[in-house]
Amino acid sequence: NLWARLKKAEQAYHIYRKLLTYVEPSGGKFSNYQHGGGTYANLFDAHPPFQIDGNFGGVAGVCEMLVQSHSILQFDNLQFTIELLPALPEAWKDGSVKGLCARGGYEIDMTWKDGQVTELQIYGKRSGKVTVRYNGKERKVNVTPYSDQGQGKY
């Protein structure tokens, strides 16, 4: 999670893979518990008593690798910035996601190839300008809100 926030893609990926290492709770042949845990066969994190921290933290880390968002208050106005693929590891150079949430009530669907965003849709619960960073560029875009007629998007 922290490595992803610091935009250290390979370190974040290494920790994520370590989280997914199979562990036997009994200390058997595949026991890795003393080397930093992993994941049990039931997909619980091997860090009792706080297994939920690892489960939710792992998901949050993946989300941070793909999308980071920030808000700042300027002149009584909240401004949002969304950064796409800020910590993308080499192992994930091609992929897609749907429904990743960002601050400000925004939702992101995107596809990427060779580490570059190729398709992007941003949906919003409210209208407004959002700064979006991707592929080495920064753009201010207008997002329309969800409505009864359909979802707002950029």
Model region roles, listed by residue range:
Residues 2-152:
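Non-catalytic C-terminal accessory modules of carbohydrate-active enzymes
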